[in-house]
């Protein structure tokens, strides 16, 4: 269990718009060195929806390769596409991440409770991982739920 502040990591990009992994690792290490107990890669300020799934997979692996313990990470895995959300979630859990943070469907506003339940049921069935812990990402002011 992670106790304490869990912070998203800013996602830095190079001039050519490619992902800057070395700076990403430095930012993560700086957050931990300055009191964060855990990290939420691809959280709010992490530009999750601006980064392709394969690039996110490489970035998460890059954090681990730099020496960051995956058990203190709860990466944002939610995307508009449930198939990519499942793939990213499985990858994070296979790496040993503490859990995953995901969004409810957000494109169409006013989804019914039954619709939300069905979405998360399909997501959980699709991930089908023994160490699955889902942290729901809920921004009241942004998602209008």
Descriptions of predicted regions:
Residues 1-7, 11-144:
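Active-site beta->alpha loop and helix N-cap motifs at the rims of alpha/beta catalytic domains
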């Amino acid at each position: 269990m992670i106790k304490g502040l869990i912070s998203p990591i800013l996602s830095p990009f190079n001039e050519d718009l490619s992902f800057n992994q070395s700076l990403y690792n430095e930012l993560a290490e700086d957050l931990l060195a300055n009191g964060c107990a855990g990290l939420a890669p691809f959280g709010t300020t992490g530009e999750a929806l601006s980064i392709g799934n394969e690039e996110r997979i490489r970035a998460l692996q890059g954090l681990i390769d730099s020496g960051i313990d995956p058990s203190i990470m709860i990466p944002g895995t939610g995307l508009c596409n449930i198939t990519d959300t499942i793939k990213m979630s499985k990858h994070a859990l296979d790496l040993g991440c503490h859990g995953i943070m995901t969004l409810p469907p957000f494109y169409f506003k006013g989804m019914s409770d039954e619709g939300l339940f069905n979405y998360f049921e399909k997501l959980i069935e699709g991930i089908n991982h023994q160490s699955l812990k889902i942290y729901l990402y809920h921004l009241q002011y942004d998602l209008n739920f």
